[in-house]
Amino acid sequence: MAHPVQLGLQDATSPVMEELVTFHDHALMAMFLISFLILYALSATLTTKLTNTNITDAQEMETIWTILPAVILVLIALPSLRILYMTDEINNPSFTIKSIGHQWYWTYEYTDYGGLIFNSYMLPPLFLNPGDLRLLEVDNRVVLPIEAPVRMMITSQDVLHSWTIPTLGLKTDAVPGRLNQTVFTATRPGVYYGQCSEICGANHSFMPIVAELIPLKIFEMGPVFTL
């Protein structure tokens, strides 16, 4: 999860998030290259004493500043498209869990376990235990397995919401009347936090998401819920 004064991204807990972190570094290198070239051109223009008022065109320079940006855009677009198709790929998920957004809480339905349904509300400050995170703890966590592809089917009962867990690289809009889906595979156990990432009304800031990831063997014994 995020920490105070954190400058980097959260630690990746899924292959997709690992790819996103790598792509972030890749795009940042391209940005540094562009910034360096622009700053160099500006400094050279300001410091040089060489001038020529008879120049009418510069074919070589125009060719360079046309081809170079095109090459940079291709180098950014190719890995971006690869990750885009990776996030949309659905390959025989082991489990399917449905998440329904409401103003202002989440409902989870385990379709593979007899249609078990429960709500997940943010814990008010008066109910927090020492060490709990303010505005991030919930009464019922969604329990998910690691090392197995899990399909999340996400929709909304009222207005637009967005089911987001940054460390898993997940952000899927919950749209009324529409069922969106995303698949992820978590790589290590733990408790991971997210929040609704679509402004959905007065209490938008008070509908957190808490996913408790446990080993697959334990999950297969029967989901463990904090009900």
From Swiss-Prot:
Tree of life domain: Eukaryota
Biological-process GO terms, alphabetical: ATP synthesis coupled electron transport
Transmembrane spans: 15-45, 60-87
Record field: catalytic activity: 4 Fe(II)-[cytochrome c] + O2 + 8 H(+)(in) = 4 Fe(III)-[cytochrome c] + 2 H2O + 4 H(+)(out)
Ranges of the Mitochondrial intermembrane topological domain: 1-14, 88-227
Free-text remark on how the cofactor is bound: Binds a dinuclear copper A center per subunit.
UniProt keyword annotations, A-Z: Copper, Electron transport, Magnesium, Membrane, Metal-binding, Mitochondrion, Mitochondrion inner membrane, Respiratory chain, Translocase, Transmembrane, Transmembrane helix, Transport
Annotated NCBIfam families: CoxB (TIGR02866)
Family: Belongs to the cytochrome c oxidase subunit 2 family.
Protein known as: Cytochrome c oxidase subunit 2
Gene encoding the protein: MT-CO2
